[in-house]
Curated annotation (Swiss-Prot):
Subcellular localization: Periplasm
GO CC terms of this entry: periplasmic space
GO biological process: alginic acid biosynthetic process
The PilZ domain, residue ranges: 16-115
Keyword Magnesium: no
Protein name stated in the entry: Alginate biosynthesis protein Alg44
Keywords: Alginate biosynthesis, Periplasm
InterPro entries: MFP, PilZ_domain
Protein function: Required for alginate biosynthesis.
Pathway(s) where this gene product acts: Glycan biosynthesis; alginate biosynthesis
GO molecular function: cyclic-di-GMP binding
The keyword tRNA processing belongs to this UniProt entry's keyword annotation: no
One Pfam family of this chain: HlyD_3
Length: 388
């Protein structure tokens, strides 16, 4: 016995299977090649063809049209068919025919009738209608083209569209991830400013001022800042005797002017000039605001009271001063309430920068935030230490 596997044998679907013919009560009305009508009794029937006897000879190969007639629940069921004569026996007039161009609904109806007859079930019109309503044939499988049918431009367009959709998706995901990260892991200050301790130079007498330095300029301790002029009458006010209060004497004293100089009390940078040149200033009025050059500028920021646990002393923060592109880092050194009597007031924090800030940045606004998210600084430090 040969048990070798024949590789040429493949699965045979029902549509390809040779159908056994069964004897079913049915009639066939058809037109022959001479357009004459014949009505015969079907001898046997299958989903692929039928046979019958006729007294009129038919030529093998002729394609004829006819109608199969069944009786189901005392109702007539007719199926229009087209068949080809495949064999003819002149001794008994038997014709074997094969169906041609049957519709899927007709094939399903024939299969149902034949299957019910073979199983011994009674054929009902309801079963036939149910068979006609459902799809009894599977769709043909789509063949994968693999892109071989696309032109070079079509492939380029497909790749471009795919890449564009991918880039947009990645950008949208990054935006959403960044927004969520900023919402849950970053505390933003409501306001911030670069602050330094300042020294005010005031006017010693009532008079006019003329500056000798520009704002932002550096000046040494004891160097002249500005000159001022005042009247002799103002100098002697309160020290005049009654004999010197005559109108002519007062007019003479008022016309005499004295000049003086304002000097710097420290090695400083001129932060602001509070009174313009040639303007009158009263005694004790601040004229200049100076910043000691040895002073390290700090950053002051205001946070919401709800963030008090996130901006404790020792917390690392990032800040950016207005007018600069560099993002600097620092550490919170103090934290206090703006108003100790008001329990709902905001929190004021002082930040010491990791690197010194130029004194010229004093008074500039700053954006401050505290990042509490996962950090990869330890991994970066290890990579730098190994020279990667």
């Amino acid at each position: 016995m040969n048990t070798a596997v024949n590789v040429n044998v493949v699965h045979e679907s029902e549509a390809q299977r040779q159908h056994a013919r069964v004897r079913i009560p049915a009639k066939l009305r058809f037109l022959d090649a001479q357009r004459q009508v014949h009505e015969v009794k079907v001898e046997d029937l299958s989903a692929g063809g039928l046979s019958f006897h006729t007294k009129q000879p038919q030529s093998v190969g002729d394609v004829l049209r006819g109608r199969l007639q069944f009786v189901v629940d005392n109702l007539g069921l007719s199926i229009d068919i087209e068949f080809q004569v495949r064999s003819y026996n002149p001794d008994n007039g038997r014709i074997g025919a094969q169906f041609q161009n049957l519709e899927p609904r007709d094939i399903a109806t024939l299969r149902h009738i034949i299957t019910s007859h073979l199983s011994g079930e009674l054929i009902s019109i309801g079963d036939v209608l149910s068979t006609l309503q459902r799809d009894n044939f599977t769709k043909a499988r789509k063949q994968k083209d693999g892109g071989s049918g696309l032109s070079a431009f079509g492939r380029f367009k497909a790749v471009t569209v795919t890449l564009g959709v991918f880039v947009v998706g990645v950008a949208a995901f990054g935006f959403v991830a960044k927004s969520l990260y900023g919402m849950y892991f970053v505390s933003h200050a409501e306001a911030g400013v670069v602050a330094v301790p300042t020294t005010n130079v005031t006017m010693p007498r009532d008079g006019t001022v003329s500056s000798l330095v520009e704002s932002g300029g550096q000046i040494a301790k004891g160097a002249p800042l500005a000159s001022f002029t005042t009247s002799m009458l103002d100098m002697l006010k309160g020290n005049l005797e009654d004999a010197q209060l005559e109108p002519a004497k007062i007019e003479e004293l008022f016309g005499k002017q004295l000049s003086g100089t304002l000097t710097s009390p420290c090695d400083c940078v001129v932060a602001r000039q509070l009174v313009d040149d040639g303007q009158y200033a009263a005694k004790g009025q601040p004229i200049f605001q100076l910043i000691p050059r040895t002073t390290t500028p700090m950053v002051e920021a205001r946070f919401s009271y709800r963030q008090f646990d996130e901006v404790k002393p020792g917390t690392r923060v990032n800040f950016q001063v207005a007018g600069e592109d560099e993002v600097r880092t620092g550490q919170i050194v103090s934290s206090a309430s703006l108003n100790s009597e008001d329990l709902s007031s905001d929190i004021r924090v002082q930040i010491k920068p990791d690197t010194g800030l130029p004194a010229e940045l004093a008074g500039r606004p700053a954006s401050v935030n505290s990042d509490r998210g996962p950090s990869l600084n330890w991994l970066i430090d290890k990579a730098v230490a190994r020279g990667l």
